[in-house]
């Protein structure tokens, strides 16, 4: 498939990986993609040039394929490590089958919330997030809280990635 890098991309997980990278770009402005002209992960300067594409992608006015092709990009699926898999209970009116990934954000890319799906952003530790949720200062839905707790077991991004590579991801259906 064009527009994907990494020969070891799990075929069964490809759609979930593509969705994860797309969502990260649309909602927080981080794009795990390689510039096909340079064969390098895009930097902040290139990311800023692509910011105007976030809203059209989100609204469905621009397809991901069109975005990647017109900007000479390939999604870096190999930079994702499968972290968790949550499935909404069957009694819920809206159901989701969601895979979560952990990845190192490119050092020179700065996250920016989109103002629609994510309207605020803050960098805090997992412990701080959990404490704020317990104190009623922050509302965190159950799957997110469990994922944050799991991330809190890691001492660093590298540790979280290593931990995720070692552990089998078991689907959770509360």
Q: Where are the language model's segments positioned?
A:
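The catalytic Nudix box helix
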Residues: 1-76
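Active-site rim elements
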Residues: 7-14, 131-139
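Terminal peptide-recognition signature
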Residues: 24, 101, 148
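Hydrophobic/aromatic-lined pockets within catalytic cores
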Residues: 25, 29-32, 134, 152-156
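NUDIX/MutT-family hydrolases
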Residues: 66-68, 73, 77-86, 95-108, ...
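Short, P/G- and charge-enriched loop/turn segments at secondary-structure junctions
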Residues: 88-90
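Core RNA-modification/binding signature centered on pseudouridine synthases
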Residues: 142-174
